[in-house]
């Protein structure tokens, strides 16, 4: 299941807080957390997402979308 989180228009700190909360409360079925951060007003949130969550323990990998305003966080499955 893909969960979407729209953070564009927020500050980097606000976006980080919402993403952290979303990661803490993921549903068991969720395999992708899709972050909609936008890009037309700068890419500060996108850059933060790609750097901060690349090494997060719940994230297997970070995938860039064909849409520059979206980054997918692929959730690590614990067996």
PLM segments and residue spans:
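Long, charged, low-complexity intrinsically disordered regions
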Residues: 1-79
